Amino acid sequence: MIGYLQGSLAGVRKQSGRLLLLLDVQGVGYEVQTPARSLVELPAAGQSLQVFTHLQVREDQWLLFGFLQMAERDLFRQLISVSGIGPQLGLALLDSLSLAELVQAIVAGNTRLLSRTPGVGAKTAERLALELRSKLAEWREEAGLLPSATAAPIAAVQEDVEMTLLALGYNNREILQALTAIAQENLVQSGQPAEDWIREAIAWLSR
């Protein structure tokens, strides 16, 4: 098993919507697929780069997947352990939400949020939550991904908040960022009604 690769970034290209890195490790070029969002964090060509890797062995080919953080690689492995979640869908999930947001959605059983990822239907989202909820609740403590105690409105309120903000034109990432920020700033408490969360979220997003 290849745990990580460290070398110089020889090139980056996109193929069929996939982000592929060419990593030069002591004269050997490794092609590594990585989450698309990693593009903004990559160094310039020729600069040093370390990626934590997952090797998938098929009958016809070996595929390397690379991640800039070990926690991201470990979460990817958890995702693809679920029936119906292949590597490409695992990467799509990692691209749709931040690490902490994705783990929180699974632990909280927020299947509505999970199913917004292209390719993830309601049944797949339910399977993710069912199979990984307890595992990730424990794992995120070790990985340091614990949310704050007031990181989101209670489940009964969250759907109303999200639907209202989506209708106003905000996207999923903006909504999650706003809800997390106003909770961390103690502008709203978990048990307050949807109207309070919506008002503060709009104010935060308008800054």
From Swiss-Prot:
SMART domains: HhH1
Location of the region described as Domain I in the Swiss-Prot/TrEMBL record: 1-68
Keyword line: Cytoplasm, DNA damage, DNA recombination, DNA repair, DNA-binding
InterPro entries according to UniProt: DNA_helicase_Holl-junc_RuvA_I (IPR013849), Hlx-hairpin-Hlx_DNA-bd_motif (IPR003583), NA-bd_OB-fold (IPR012340), RuvA (IPR000085), RuvA_2-like (IPR010994), RuvA_C (IPR011114), RuvA_C_sf (IPR036267)
Region of interest: Domain II: 69-147
Primary localisation category: cytoplasm
GO molecular function: ATP binding; four-way junction DNA binding; four-way junction helicase activity
GO biological process: DNA recombination; DNA repair
Gene Ontology CC entries for this record: cytoplasm; Holliday junction helicase complex; Holliday junction resolvase complex
Record has Cell wall biogenesis/degradation as a keyword: no
Region of interest (Domain III), ranges: 158-207
Subcellular location: Cytoplasm
A Pfam family per the record: RuvA_C
Chain spans, region Flexible linker: 148-158
Signal sequence, start to end: none
Domain notes for this protein: Has three domains with a flexible linker between the domains II and III and assumes an 'L' shape. Domain III is highly mobile and contacts RuvB.
Alphabetized HAMAP family for the sequence: DNA_HJ_migration_RuvA
Stated family: Belongs to the RuvA family.
NCBIfam families: ruvA (TIGR00084)
Complex formation: Homotetramer. Forms an RuvA(8)-RuvB(12)-Holliday junction (HJ) complex. HJ DNA is sandwiched between 2 RuvA tetramers; dsDNA enters through RuvA and exits via RuvB. An RuvB hexamer assembles on each DNA strand where it exits the tetramer. Each RuvB hexamer is contacted by two RuvA subunits (via domain III) on 2 adjacent RuvB subunits; this complex drives branch migration. In the full resolvosome a probable DNA-RuvA(4)-RuvB(12)-RuvC(2) complex forms which resolves the HJ.
Function according to Swiss-Prot or TrEMBL: The RuvA-RuvB-RuvC complex processes Holliday junction (HJ) DNA during genetic recombination and DNA repair, while the RuvA-RuvB complex plays an important role in the rescue of blocked DNA replication forks via replication fork reversal (RFR). RuvA specifically binds to HJ cruciform DNA, conferring on it an open structure. The RuvB hexamer acts as an ATP-dependent pump, pulling dsDNA into and through the RuvAB complex. HJ branch migration allows RuvC to scan DNA until it finds its consensus sequence, where it cleaves and resolves the cruciform DNA.
Name of the protein in question: Holliday junction branch migration complex subunit RuvA
Organism of this sequence: Synechococcus elongatus (strain ATCC 33912 / PCC 7942 / FACHB-805)
